[in-house]
Amino acid sequence: MLSNLLLTGLPKSGKSTLLENFISLVGDRKRGLLTREVLRNDERIGFDVVTSEPETARLARVDFASSLRVGKYGVDTSLFETVLRPLFNVKEGELLYVDEIGQMQLHSVEFGRLVQRYLDAPQLCIGTVSTVYEHSVISALRERKDTQIIEVKVENRERVFSIVKEVGERYLKGETVLEPITI
């Protein structure tokens, strides 16, 4: 039985925006996190994580002095992990979401545990996953029988959003079985 829906695609394909737009339509019955870019003078200087609690933490910055690096960004897992703790307290009926299961986030072992917790939960979990980075957590989730992965492309973004919205609405009405989706 499918209970997880993961959106994948190249950077800038729209997968995070799609998930964020969907999550904004869901009421209070949700738990998870979104990764947002931080801009200064129209230039990306880092990434923050915003949770459903709501809490915000800096995840990465160009000026972080950290041994954990992703490109030009230093990653601070201690700040990140502080806001993750409450997200483990999953309540029945909540829709779970994670943006993004990617290289910066997976520097945190706690984040890997949270992803596993969400994917193993009986609730619907909708997330985004990197296509440009491999990690044991990403490899394992690609093999899960309870997970459907949909590639988001410019030409199918609107269709994928409609599908995600429909699946989420059905789940929140009490339908717990996710049917295989064809794009």
Segments the model singles out, each with a brief description of its role:
Residues 98-99:
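Hydrophobic residues in beta-strands of the RecA-like P-loop NTPase core, especially within AAA+ ATPase
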Residues 20-24, 85, 165, 169:
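Generic solvent-exposed, charged/amphipathic alpha-helical segments
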Residues 15:
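Conserved lysine of the Walker
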Residues 20-70:
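N-terminal phosphate/diphosphate-binding loop that engages ATP/GTP or pyrophosphate donors
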Residues 10:
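P-loop (Walker A) phosphate-binding loop of NTP-binding proteins
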Residues 7:
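Hydrophobic anchor at the beta1->P-loop junction of P-loop NTPases
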Residues 52-94:
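Helix-adjacent hinge/juxtasegments
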